[in-house]
C-alpha cells in the first residue's frame, strides 16, 4: 500500500525518481512496470503498478459500452494510459503530453493513495490540499460513514 505525500523533482527530460521506500514493493508486485494516465477528475496523473492497473482495466472492460459516459471514461483513462518502467536508478519518464495535462514542471508531489499514486504539480497540490482541509472542517461537510471511522 502506498501512503504519504512526497516532494519530488522532475529533471529536464521529465524523469522523476520514485522514492526509495516504494521501490521494493513496485519491483516485487509488477517488476517495476507502471501505468501512468490522467486523473479524470483532478488535474493530476495517476500512477499504478501494472498489477493494479490490470484490475482497473477489467472493471472498465465490464462497463456497458452503449452508455456514453462509460465510453468517455474508457477513452480518457485507457486512451491516455502509458506503460512505463522504473530504470536501474528507480526513475521513470513522464511523457510530455501527460506532463502538460498535469502542468508538471520541476517541483511535484507524489501522493500515495493506497493502491496507486497521484502525481501533482506542487503548487496545485498545495492549493487543493488546503481547499480540501477547509472544506472538510465545515459543519455538516463530513458524511455519516466517515464520522464513524476511528482515526
From Swiss-Prot:
Main location as per UniProt: cytoplasm
Source superkingdom: Bacteria
The UniProt record lists the keyword DNA-binding: yes
Cellular localisation: Cytoplasm, Nucleoid
Keywords per UniProt: Cytoplasm, DNA-binding, Repeat, Transcription, Transcription regulation
PROSITE patterns to which the protein is assigned, alphabetical: SPOVT_ABRB (PS51740)
A UniProt-annotated Pfam family: MraZ
One Gene Ontology term, aspect cellular component: nucleoid
Family of this protein: Belongs to the MraZ family.
Protein name listed in UniProt: Transcriptional regulator MraZ
The species this protein was found in: Pseudomonas fluorescens (strain ATCC BAA-477 / NRRL B-23932 / Pf-5)
Amino acid at each position: 500500500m502506498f501512503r504519504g505525500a512526497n516532494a519530488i523533482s522532475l529533471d529536464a527530460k521529465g524523469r522523476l525518481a520514485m522514492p526509495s521506500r516504494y521501490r521494493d514493493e513496485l519491483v516485487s508486485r509488477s517488476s517495476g512496470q507502471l501505468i501512468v494516465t490522467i486523473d479524470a477528475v483532478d488535474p493530476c496523473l495517476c500512477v499504478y503498478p501494472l498489477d493494479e492497473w490490470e484490475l482497473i482495466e477489467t472493471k472498465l472492460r465490464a462497463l456497458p459500452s452503449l452508455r456514453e459516459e462509460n465510453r468517455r471514461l474508457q477513452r480518457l483513462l485507457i486512451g491516455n494510459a502509458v506503460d512505463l518502467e522504473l530504470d536501474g536508478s528507480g526513475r521513470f519518464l513522464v511523457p510530455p503530453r501527460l506532463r502538460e495535462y498535469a502542468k508538471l514542471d520541476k517541483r511535484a508531489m507524489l501522493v500515495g493513495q493506497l493502491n496507486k499514486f497521484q502525481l501533482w504539480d506542487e503548487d496545485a497540490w498545495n492549493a487543493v490540499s488546503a481547499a480540501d482541509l477547509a472544506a472538510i472542517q465545515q459543519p455538516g461537510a463530513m458524511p455519516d460513514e466517515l464520522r464513524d471511522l476511528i482515526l
